[in-house]
Amino acid sequence: MIISGSGLPLDLPKQTAGSNIKLIPIVSSARALNIIYRKWKQNYNKVPDAVVVEGPMAGGHLGFSFNDVLNNTAPTLEQLVKEVVDFVDTVEETIPVIAAGGIFDGNDIAKFLKLGASGVQMATRFVCTTECDVHDDFKQAYITAKKEDITIIHSPVGLPGRVILNEFTKRVTKGETIPFRCPHHCLRSCNPRTAPYCIAKVLADASKGRLNNAFVFAGSNAYRCTEIVSVKTLINQLKEELSNSL
């Protein structure tokens, strides 16, 4: 299974031709899914096996304009899920819709299931589990964060990103640069000659707890995490909340 974000993966079926790999694009609009659907079907006789609809409350890089995210003028996840579900209902194939971005508890899960989603994608909650393999300092950034610490930055790749405010974030926001060589060439939109720092290195350092020169990506509800629990405990809690909300 490949879950593909950061742009429209119009040629992805070409890369997996002859395999049974499931292809699941991440989109931020029904229009994006419409384009992917038509191109895949026309060129490869293939449609998405499912689709993740990611809204503006997600952590990390976001598929919306900086101002829309900052000013809360981007479409809500509720609006996006409804639009995508409506589009999927017009095609002959069955394409499960998975809601993502800011989903925190079983009540949220129930809300999106009622809107027609087949499931949800959650990341922030699972950072604060014992099984998550990031450094403990990364997890503690979630536990100690306040609501006002969750902020939006301009990422070097040209997208807004949601992070937890720390000293490194303040420094680079004020214009500090960290020279680097670019071994990755991960995105064309990132120019290593003008980028203030390497986002790939920053994220790798964050996962290892080197937060003096890194920041932590996090969803809009990260500040609501208060403890580290096992995945089993979290799943049981979500199931109970979901059951009570349906």
Language model regions located:
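Conserved active-site-proximal phosphate/metal-binding subdomains
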Residues: 57-77, 81-98, 104-246
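Active-site entrance/lid segments in N-terminal catalytic domains of soluble metabolic enzymes
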Residues: 1-91
